[in-house]
Curated annotation (Swiss-Prot):
Coiled coil: none annotated. One of its GO terms (cellular component) is cytosol. It holds the Pfam family Ribosomal_S20p. Binds directly to 16S ribosomal RNA. This is Small ribosomal subunit protein bS20. One of its GO terms (molecular function) is small ribosomal subunit rRNA binding. Disulfide bonds: none annotated. Belongs to the bacterial ribosomal protein bS20 family. It comes from Corynebacterium efficiens (strain DSM 44549 / YS-314 / AJ 12310 / JCM 11189 / NBRC 100395).
Length: 87
């Protein structure tokens, strides 16, 4: 337990940020999971719409500072490759 007042405040702030980031990361992972489920189902239309949703979620997470932009770009690229393999 911190004794310094500023550190006590930082601990509170860090905990709030951790919970917020955790929720955003979880939402992004859920959208990516839905995309992979659509790919496994072989439904190209559903996969395309889910790809759009997952990409948007990743972009929003980057804007909020949860993911680094290069990390999100790599994830989006990986999703696009999986979609293109569906043919």
């Amino acid at each position: 337990m911190a004794n310094i007042k500023s550190q006590i405040k930082r601990n509170k702030t860090n905990e709030k940020a951790r919970l917020r980031n955790q929720a955003i990361r979880s939402a992004v992972r859920t959208e990516i999971r839905k995309f992979h489920a659509a790919i496994d189902g072989g439904d190209k239309a559903a996969a395309e719409s889910q790809l759009r949703v997952a990409s948007r979620a990743l972009d929003k997470a980057v804007t909020k500072g949860v993911f680094h932009r290069n990390n999100a770009a790599n994830k989006k690229s990986s999703l696009a490759r999986a979609f293109n393999k569906l043919g």
